[in-house]
């Protein structure tokens, strides 16, 4: 009898812990400062983020909520991907960690810009095409560059530089970036209703 009560209490603690984590994710989406006045659609993840997952997830909102292809998707921590397919009440998101996903980024506080690409399912990216004359250091913060033609607005947080490699002959540096957003077990995400000008 005591063992059954102990097991029941352990189950309740686990359930409460999961609920607390989901609440924390939801609270992070309230008033995300880096999207400014751009409207967002709050969504719930309906498939694709259980543990070590692939490179896509499905959200419970679609075109009826104003969502269109190529719109950025964020959590309270930063950019996680972009919308690649849209139905009336669902959309599919390609995650930033995907090996096929590319995003223009800038290193905050410097003039350094580059292109980051996912490593295929990890919470890390590889940044390339950085002018080696620009000083980039480990610990530097990266965000979307928002340069002309970019599918992303400027200043969406991406992650932190964890390694820098310089090829002096090519005048180019590459960096490793660890994403701010944890892509494991996502429950909520916001679609930023933003489209590039033109």
Spans of features found by a protein language model:
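A secondary-structure micro-motif
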Residues: 14-18, 24-198
